[in-house]
C-alpha cells in the first residue's frame, strides 16, 4: 500500500491533476489500501469456484473484478459486511487482509486466498475545505501543507501495510486457512482481468 500510495500521488501530479477533479477543495493526499484478498466461507480451489457465489464487492474497479470473475455481487457498505457474512447474505468478500482483524472477519470467513500482486487496490483521497484552510493561522496552514502531498500519501500507505500485517497475524491466530494462489490461477486471473483493464482505459 505504501508503494502504491506514493505512486498514485506521483501519477496524479504528473498526469491527472490537470483534470481538476478536486476543484473547490484542497487535495492533501492520496492513498490506496493494501492488496485485496479473497475471503470465503468455503475453500477456493480455482477461480471457477467463485462463479455464482454471493460475494460482497465494493464499487469501482472492485465491482468490475467481481463481474469478470462471475460472482453474484452483493453491494453493502463496509460496516455491514460482518452481519452479511454471519447471516448468509454473503458467501465471501473481496477486501484487504487487515479486515480479518479490524472487521473481525476471522470469525465468519475462515478461508483466505492471496492473489500475488493483489486482487485489486482501492483508492482514497484526503481533501480539506478551502474556507476552513483559509481560516487557520498561517503557521497552522503551513504545518498542514508541509506534511501533505506525497508525505501524507506515504504515511497512509505505511499504516495500511501495518494493518495488513496485524490482520494476517490475527487470522493465523484464529486458525484461518491462508493460501497463496498458484501461478496457474494467477495467470488465469490476469487473462480475465485484461478485459477489465481495456474497459478502464477506454472509459
Language-model regions: role of each:
Residues 7:
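Cys/His-rich zinc-coordinating modules
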Residues 1-3, 13-203:
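N-terminal secretory/targeting leader peptides
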Amino acid at each position: 500500500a505504501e508503494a502504491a500510495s506514493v505512486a498514485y500521488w506521483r501519477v496524479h501530479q504528473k498526469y491527472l491533476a490537470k483534470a481538476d477533479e478536486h476543484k473547490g477543495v484542497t487535495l492533501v493526499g492520496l492513498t490506496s489500501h493494501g492488496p485485496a484478498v479473497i475471503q470465503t466461507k468455503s475453500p477456493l480451489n480455482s477461480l471457477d469456484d467463485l462463479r455464482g457465489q454471493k460475494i460482497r464487492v465494493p464499487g469501482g474497479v472492485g465491482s468490475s473484478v467481481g463481474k469478470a470473475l462471475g460472482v453474484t455481487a452483493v453491494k453493502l457498505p463496509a460496516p455491514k459486511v460482518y452481519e452479511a457474512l454471519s447471516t448468509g447474505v454473503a458467501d465471501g468478500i473481496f477486501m484487504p487482509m487487515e479486515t480479518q482483524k479490524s472487521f473481525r472477519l476471522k470469525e465468519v470467513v475462515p478461508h483466505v486466498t492471496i492473489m500475488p500482486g493483489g486482487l485489486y487496490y482501492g483508492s482514497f483521497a484526503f481533501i480539506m475545505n478551502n474556507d476552513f484552510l483559509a481560516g487557520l493561522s498561517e503557521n497552522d496552514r503551513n504545518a498542514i501543507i508541509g506534511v501533505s502531498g506525497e508525505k501524507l500519501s506515504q504515511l497512509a500507505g505505511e499504516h495500511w501495510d501495518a494493518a495488513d500485517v496485524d490482520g494476517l497475524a490475527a487470522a493465523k491466530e484464529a486458525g484461518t486457512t491462508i493460501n497463496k494462489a498458484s501461478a496457474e490461477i494467477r495467470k488465469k486471473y490476469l487473462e480475465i482481468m485484461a478485459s477489465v483493464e481495456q474497459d478502464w482505459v477506454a472509459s
